[in-house]
Amino acid sequence: MKQLFATTSRGFEELLKVELTDLGAQECRVVQGGVHFIANDETQYRILLWSRLSSRILLPLITTKIYSDLDLYSAIVGQNWLTHFDERVTFLVDFNGTNREIRHTQFGAMRVKDGIVDYFERHGKTRPNVDKEYPDIRIHAYLNQDELVVSLDLSGEALHLRGYREDTGKAPLRETLAAAIVLRSSWEKGTPLVDPMCGSGTLLIEAAQMEAQIAPQLHRLHWGFDFWKGHNQVVWEKVKQEAVELAEQAFNRKLTPHFWGFDLDHRVLKKAQKNAQNAGVSHLIKWQQGDVAGLKNPTEQEIGTVICNPPYGERLGTTPALIALYSVFGRQLKTEFADWNVSIFSGEPALLDCLRLRAYRQFKAKNGPLDCVQKNYHIAVRKQVESAVENSQEKTLTFVSENTQVAQDFANRLRKNIKKIDKWANQQKLDAYRLYDADLPEYNLAVDRYADHIIVQEYAAPKNVDENKARQRLLDAVSAILLVTGIETNKLILKVRQKQKGTSQYEKLANKGEYFYVHEYGAKLWVNLTDYLDTGLFLDHRLTRKMLGEMAVGKDFLNLFAYTGSATVHAALGLAKSTTTVDMSNTYLNWAEQNLLLNDIEGKQHKLIQADCLQWLNKCDRQFDLIFVDPPTFSNSKRMEDSWDVQRDHIKLMANLKRILRTNGTIVFSNNKRGFKMDIDGLQELELSAVEISAKTLPLDFERNKQIHNCWIIRHQS
């Protein structure tokens, strides 16, 4: 009997213990990362051949305390390596762990290697060679604080490498992880198993091999024990022959195919088919291209299990399409798989909430570095009500759920808004406008339409609102938006908006570089919905830009703090004599230039200037008839000499603007500070007059948000 150790992924130790016991292991003891056990030769080989959960099977040779690299070297060079392999074989050292003295795994591996080759030299043998690619012998060293365990790796290559997977889709599951998911899924052999997003087919292939009694390592050609002197070839051949006969018997029973794999990508399905063929289970699995939104139960009145590892993102805010995917998936499960079991493995528990199902059991696990969860559900039998709705001779089946519609109040409000605002926008020839702006306090978000795209901007929840509850409401709202608008999931963008500090509104979020243009009162304006927090177009200033276009005829126009120059476009299309566009950001100034070119606006009379707007204004000696200034509420950018506060500094700004404003000129001044108070007395001292026009510049889609901006007409006193 030998003392052995089976390694596995964290979270699967107890499951592995059950498997090892079933395979004949004795005295199994669970520790983090694996199971200690004892076994005779026959059981040892059976575990190597049949374990679906083990990553490696290790034979410990040295267990000792080490406090320095000399201790490490001494422990290795003192081991009798010739009892395990001779000098003609190649070897490789895998070293894991550190302590105070051995602080790098590469150094640890080198010292183990030195000890082994020096041992052979001391015994009059040639130094065995190291082979990093295909070693005959693999030595596994593990250091935990001061305790060292050095083992012979009987597996060779890791046991998750079954040999059937030639190619994969994105983010494939390790075979050992897939087997664990299947074993925890509540699926029973002989019953249907459906994977609606099967990818390269690993879950189904692992399950099918269990059904077909195919040992996972049956076709492995090279083992870590091939050149080990303790290898018992006779016992090994016996165990392997038993496995071959079991697989043949199962094949001769002509098992009925009851595994189904669906995927939207036909190229990935071809890989899955090839993998299944290599694994010897292609006759058991049916593959079909299909979208989750149209998922149908492929069986006839049978009860089975749906198993799935859907895609998931590490950041929920970048994956609105996944919210839609899980929502639609949950709906199809309830519609098509009544009385079935469902097991879903995901790295984002919040996405599983979108299924709108209640798990009766869940497990934690790791998928590489990601913390994941597997949840098991049972789909309740739903009442099916057949309503004879005659519509083009079609009969509609209406399914009545015990659950109420997700975010029903929000969905109803959104429908109402769309009906009103879409009609108005079509009349105004607009295709970028707001559909919803925190109308209901519990759904604190904005929904904007940009042509055939939808942006959902979540306002940061107050500190007293439970984070999980806020996240669930967001998921519910996104599901409702997809249902109400019918938009394609890849055209919905989700952003989290918070109070901006300094120039953070200009910070880049992504680098997709996807631009398209929208129409606004005859102007065409480029927008980018993904790369920045803002899109390049402030929708609430739409009427202000229109007004500027109407006022600009024959005038010299200045756009200060110009952003992407959309106001300049309107002024130029309004036949301004000249335009000057000033902004500190080169990115946005280039954007402004592209906006002008998009509208065929060219010429020396249209100037674009990159500069600190306040510093440029101090030096400007040119006069203007019409000035639009929409400064930030606050800024402390390193590129500005001084900080800026619109409430504190607006009179100083007006004093500078007065200097360059012609006698009959007009300043259109706007900002987004809530509760802004114009210093009327300060303006009078400057001999300027101000009229607030905020209400006149609020378009229909922003009429509920009276404080989104304030706007003023400022002129010289007559």
Curated annotation (Swiss-Prot):
One GO CC term, this protein: cytoplasm
Record GO terms (molecular function): 23S rRNA (guanine(2445)-N(2))-methyltransferase activity; RNA binding; rRNA (guanine-N7-)-methyltransferase activity
Family from the record: Belongs to the methyltransferase superfamily. RlmKL family.
Gene3D superfamilies on file: 3.30.2130.30, RNA methyltransferase domain (HRMD) like, Vaccinia Virus protein VP39
Function: Specifically methylates the guanine in position 2445 (m2G2445) and the guanine in position 2069 (m7G2069) of 23S rRNA.
Top-level EC class as recorded in UniProt: transferase
Catalytic reactions on record: guanosine(2445) in 23S rRNA + S-adenosyl-L-methionine = N(2)-methylguanosine(2445) in 23S rRNA + S-adenosyl-L-homocysteine + H(+); guanosine(2069) in 23S rRNA + S-adenosyl-L-methionine = N(2)-methylguanosine(2069) in 23S rRNA + S-adenosyl-L-homocysteine + H(+)
The EC number(s) this enzyme carries: 2.1.1.173, 2.1.1.264
Keywords: Cytoplasm, Methyltransferase, RNA-binding, rRNA processing, S-adenosyl-L-methionine, Transferase
Protein name as annotated: Ribosomal RNA large subunit methyltransferase K/L
InterPro entries, A to Z: 23SrRNA_methyltr_KL (IPR017244), DNA_methylase_N6_adenine_CS (IPR002052), RlmKL-like_Mtase (IPR000241), RlmKL-like_Mtase_CS (IPR053943), RlmL_1st (IPR054170), SAM-dep_methyl-trfase (IPR019614), SAM-dependent_MTases_sf (IPR029063), THUMP_dom (IPR004114)
Stored PROSITE patterns: THUMP, UPF0020
Residues annotated as domain THUMP: 43-154
Coiled-coil spans in chain: none
SMART domains assigned to the protein according to its UniProt record, in alphabetical order: THUMP
